[in-house]
Amino acid sequence: MKIFHIVSNKEWGGGEQYVYDLSQRQRADGIDVGIFCKPVETIVQKYAETGMDVLPLALGGALDLKSAWQMARVIRNLRIRESEDQSVILHAHNFKDAFTACYARSLAGRKQVRVVMCRHLTRKGKNSWLYRWLYRHLDRLIFDSELSKSEFLSTHPAIDASKLGVVHTSIVVPKEVTPVDIRTRFGIPSDCVIGMYHGRLDPEKGLDTLLDAVALLQDPSFLKDTSHLSPLTSHLLILVGRGSDEYTAHLKQVAADKGISDKVVFAGFVHPVLPYVAAADFGILASTVQEGCPLSPQEYMSQGHPVVVTNNGGQREYVIQEQNGLLVPPGDAQALAGAMARLIDDAPLRQRLGQQAKADFDDHLDYAHYYAQIKTVYGV
């Protein structure tokens, strides 16, 4: 089998890392993997250093026939036999690249070529004549959550339901993760409970609501109303990640205005992030938008930590209320603060939820489980 992943973003991000992890796992299985990507030096270099064939193309979308011709030429030049085990898979990760892949297959005239696409966004399906053509020519369309699939189907796109599937995305976890000593690094006392968010610093991640929640945790009247003793156990929020200079400055100003600057640490971008995740006591995802299968909750779960997440995205398909985490409505600072207060004040609850989170991740969320499912997508 020969697999080509098609990657058309202009900078390295989560999608590129997803393809990197998947391609390396496929190569470990003895599969020949190549990458079609834009001629962006950092992206080309990152993939090429693994030893994979990297083929730069413009990848301009549905009307870019030149890239389709170039891709078709590569396919025609492959030495493949007319047998099932010599199938060629064009694996697209968005619709515009799926168009290019379908054009290339037609131009190459190779019947062994299959086009599959993994949908990593939660969007309504389009139903124009152009997309109806694409749906007919795709072999499989895989969503990262039931939510994403349901949202896509809400507009009744004309696609054969047998082509659709759901595979929850996962993360690659090293065999050993050594926690960073963030307490020493940031001068955090040993008895302080650490809540952590990691990811982009962006308004859609609900970070303003999160800061509102931290402010409520300092309010004796709120704690009294929620049956918590005042003051709470010593606690701190660490924000790991970066965003625009403007929005980062906004968050710091909000923290200052609310008098919680001493309760919030801006750690900036770190890589790898799992050693930081491992050093936290619980994780937080306060996203106000519907994310298909956000990975940050899985990262905390993999390290045996409970999570507080909003209930509006695909995370509710694997974070189960009161079993491995706590769910709250998006944009609800009081509900978020209440859930955080429970984890801050109740160490046995953190331990119970964290143990189940780890068990659930190992049982049905880890990368081995994901990879076993994704292999079936290729249909060979």
Segments the model singles out, each with a brief description of its role:
Residues M1-S230, S234-V380:
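Membrane-interface segments of envelope glycosyltransferases acting on lipid-linked substrates or membrane lipids
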